[in-house]
A protein has these predicted regions:
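Short coil-to-beta transition motif at edge beta-strands of beta-rich domains
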Residues: 43-50
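A conserved amphipathic terminal alpha-helix motif
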Residues: 99, 105-141
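Secondary-structure boundary/capping motif
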Residues: 1-3, 48, 85-87, 101, ...
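Short, intrinsically disordered, mixed-charge
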Residues: 19-26, 68, 128-131, 135, ...
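Generic recognition of short, well-ordered alpha-helical interface segments
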Residues: 12, 58, 124-128
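Hydrophobic ligand-binding cavity/cleft-lining segments
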Residues: 1-41
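Hydrophobic-ligand binding "helix-grip"
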Residues: 52-99, 105-108, 135
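Short, exposed beta-strand/loop patches in secreted or surface proteins that constitute
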Residues: 38-42, 62-65
Length: 141
């Protein structure tokens, strides 16, 4: 398995971040330079969503973890490996703040070889994506 993550502590509650993230997944909000999401059914456990990364072809992701308002994860098969994206919004020790984490796990045969090749390119926009989500949450409040 190969993994990477990006984490930020922000001055918003997990609930506010979760609500905004669900609007992104539902296609109600499109983040600048972010992935575009088009759900095929109501967003929740097992939901199938068409995700279109900016400038790339669409892929089908499936929601595999759903723990409102703290964790959502989705998975896609790609080139013989499984890519799992986990988005978490956890309360920080300081009241009113949260730790936002976006994590990528690449699993399956050959993941140790494929992960370092494709993973950094996939995850390079994680910092910008978190910043855009936080900005959208502030506007949405």
């Amino acid at each position: 398995m190969w993994s990477t993550e990006c984490q930020r502590t922000v001055d918003l509650t997990a609930e506010v971040l979760w609500e905004t993230w669900i609007k992104v997944l539902s296609g109600d909000i499109e983040l600048p330079k972010g992935d575009r999401y088009e759900p095929r059914e109501p967003v929740g456990p097992g939901a199938s969503i068409t995700m279109t990364p900016e400038g790339q072809d669409s892929i089908e992701i499936t929601v595999i973890r759903w723990e409102p308002p703290h964790v959502q994860a989705d998975r896609v098969s790609y080139g013989g490996v499984e890519l799992t994206f986990t988005h978490s919004f956890m309360p920080a020790q300081t009241q009113g703040k949260s730790v936002v984490t976006t994590r990528l796990d690449i699993d399956g045969p050959g993941a140790d070889d494929v992960g370092p090749t494709i993973g950094p390119g996939i995850a390079e926009d994680f910092p910008q994506a978190i910043d855009s989500l936080v900005q959208a949450a502030r506007v949405d409040m």
